[in-house]
Structures are given as C-alpha cells and as structure tokens.
Amino acid sequence: MQRYIQRLEEGHDLSPEEAEDAVGKILSTAQDEEIGRFLLALRAKGEKPEEIAGFVRGMKKAGKTIRPKTSFRLVDTCGTGGDGLNTINISTAAAIVTAAAGVPVAKHGNRAATSMSGSSDVLDALGIKTDLEPEAVRQTIEEIGIGFMFAPVFHPAMKRVAGVRKKLGVRTVFNILGPLTNPAGTKGQVIGVFDKKLCEPIAYALAELGTEHALVVHGDGMDEITNTGETYVAELKDGKVSTYTLTPEALGMLRANPEDIKGGTPKENARDLLCIFKGQKGPKRDIVVMNAAAALYVGGIVGSIRQAIPIAEDAIDSGKVMVKFNQFKTFTSEFYRQKNKESLSGKSMSMRSRTSILSPASGERV
C-alpha cells in the first residue's frame, strides 16, 4: 500500500492492475491510516477511467456475483446518490417500469446515504424484501425479470472502509463505485452521477469493463435524467463514447419545477410510487417514464429514448407495472419466508442435536 500511496501523492496514475490490487488490499489487510491516505491522495490527483475500472474489478473480486440467464440484455438503473436534492426514488421506480415493459433488470442499491429514502428503504416500505441471498436474487431475475441486489449482502467487505470514509467526511472514489460494481454483470446501464464532470470518465471506465451500452447522466443537479431542465449524457455504445444534452421537450415531455418531484420519507415515497404505478399522471410519473425509457433504450429493444417513451407509458396504463410490482412483492416475500423457515429449522435441529448427546440417565454429555 505504501508504494501506491507514494505514487498517488506524487501525482502519478496507477495502472488498472495496480488499482485492482490496491482495492483488494483496502478490503482485506490495509490499515485505516493507509486507507485514509490512499483515498485522499487519489481524490487530490483525480481518478482516471483506467483506475476506476481497476477498482471495480477489485471490488467485484472481493464480493459475491450472480449470472442470471435472460432473453434480453440485462440492465440496471442506479445512481451514485449524493446530489442532496431529496427527490422521489426515480431509478427504483424506473426499474420496475422497465421490467414490466419486458427488459430484465438487476437493480443494485443500498439504504439512503444523503437523502431520506434510498432504494432499499423505499422497496422495504413497499413490502418488497431486499436483503435476499445471491441465489434467491438470481432466481427472481430469471423468473419474473427483476431482482434487487442489496449492496451489503453482495459487498460485505465494504464494512472495512465504512469507518474510514465516515471519519474522512469527504467524497472518495467509493462514492462512485457502487453503480459500477453491479454483481449481476449487467451489459446495459443507466447510471446517474452527482457531478457532471464524472459522466465521461465513468463512461470510459464502463468501456474498459466491457459494458455494451450505457448512459451516464447528470440532470439539472441530480443523478437522474430530469424533466426540470437539461440532462448531460455521456453515452457508451459500440465501444465509443459520445456526449450530448437532453431536454424534456426533446423527449415529448413537459418541463417541471424541482418542487414537483420532491420526495420525503420512505413511506411517503412508497405512496408516490404506488400512485405512479396505478396510472396517476404528473411530473413524478413523467420523470420515472423518462428514466425507464432510457433503460429500455440501453436494453436494446428500441433505437432511441424517445421511441421508448410510449412503451414505458403503456406499461403503466395497461396495468403491467402493477402486475410486475405485485409479482416482485410476492416472489421476494416467499423467498424471505423460506429463509426464515430454514433458519428456524436449523435452530431446532441444533437444539435436538445438543439434547441427543446427553445421557438420558445422568444428563451428562456422552
């Protein structure tokens, strides 16, 4: 670690292999002081796409992965968070709309970091179980076309850096790695970032990682495609990165005010999402539709985001989204019940085992 820290403090870039090795050490043997110095030195130098790709490979190597079999390109809708705008859970709602429209989704997420409601928080409030084991998530994706991968389950080693990150009190490379480390190996991604300057580096990092089609977006201060102003997009397609801006009008949508898409607590956001799923129109539905359309585009079923807008709208208005939501809720609840049943059965077996090795006559162990 000391060699890597010195290189960074001198302003030198790490090779992808060095970055991968460094994050492996951070997640296993590095001391807190070394981790802190490394993260601050990297932050001061600035992360290069090749370094980001190396960090992602290292994190995936240290974590748990799944490989669901799907008929269409598997996609994820995930943001870095950290925009501080406290909107409704746009990418989470968009994931369910996307799956209802026929493109399989492996949603990667966590609890709230800076907002009141993270993806896991709102799904829990909706009655969808989020902390399933990897095999259960794989089956969920294959059976109903959507699954949720709770970051602490798939990346348990991240606990090692939680204290250091909190103590540093500044954004580090780990603030951008979450959306890039999808455990299902998604080849299509819509990634929202909290800073416009991150769009291109992350798109180039995704190219290094073999992603087929991705949109890295920053819209009017938020880590989403927005209907409140312009969205800056870095698009990775066919191995090339291009940049452009989107407006709601260009997608045939109405422009909204930031207040129109504000969120609240997980329960409040859950109510908003259910209203959208049931067909209620308005700015909150519009922004979900726009982001779902982007996911359908990277999923490969249409040639542009605009072409996907009516597909996303029809998924809601036809009732397909509510059907998919109910499937998601039922399927994850069943896995959760099985998990608890097996856990209770294991405890019962353990108690019987302890009882069986006692002498019936004396109560002494034999």
From Swiss-Prot:
Its EC number is 2.4.2.18. Anthranilate 1 binds at G79, N110. Anthranilate 2 binds at R165. Keywords: Amino-acid biosynthesis, Aromatic amino acid biosynthesis, Glycosyltransferase, Magnesium, Metal-binding, Transferase, Tryptophan biosynthesis. Binds 2 magnesium ions per monomer. Signal peptide: none annotated. PANTHER family: ANTHRANILATE PHOSPHORIBOSYLTRANSFERASE (PTHR43285:SF2). This is Anthranilate phosphoribosyltransferase. It comes from Methanosarcina barkeri (strain Fusaro / DSM 804).
